């Protein structure tokens, strides 16, 4: 008879908590105005979780275990969301400097735009679309 060691259940609880947090980050970025009932399956499809029921179980913390491919997909999607969010913030900062004094801040504006472009390129290389 095999028993679950405390270490296994602790790792499982950690994976569940991480998956739920990553799901929340992805929903916030990729489906911000959708109801959870539609946002969870939309994000799940994006990260490669094919079953809406499985996605809801992971989000609710009810899944018995989290597969590595599911966690990897969620991590990649969350990283992409963070990169795109940061790129948008850099663009906003460049736009603000442009409104203040475009000639004076030109080197900084160009640098911010270049960084934003690089971040978008990195985000496009992440697995989930």
Regions found by a protein language model. Name each.
Residues 52-64:
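Recognition helix of helix-turn-helix/homeodomain-like DNA-binding domains
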Residues 48-49, 64, 83, 102:
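Alpha-helix boundary/capping and short turn/kink residues
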Residues 1-29, 72-76:
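Basic, amphipathic alpha-helix used for nucleic-acid engagement in HTH/winged-helix/SANT-Myb modules
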Residues 66-86:
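Short Lys/Arg-enriched helix C-cap and helix-to-coil transition segments
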């Amino acid at each position: 008879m095999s028993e679950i060691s405390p270490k296994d259940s602790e790792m499982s609880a950690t994976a569940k908590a991480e998956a739920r947090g990553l799901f929340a980050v992805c929903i916030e970025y990729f489906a911000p105005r959708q109801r959870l009932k539609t946002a969870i399956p939309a994000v799940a499809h994006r990260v490669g979780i094919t079953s809406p029921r499985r996605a809801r179980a992971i989000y609710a913390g009810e899944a018995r275990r989290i597969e590595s491919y599911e966690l990897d997909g969620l991590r990649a999607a969350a990283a992409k969301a963070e990169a795109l969010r940061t790129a948008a913030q850099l663009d906003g900062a460049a736009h603000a400097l442009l409104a203040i004094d475009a000639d004076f801040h030109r080197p900084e504006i160009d640098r911010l735009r270049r960084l934003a472009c690089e971040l978008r390129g990195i985000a496009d290389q992440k697995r989930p679309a």
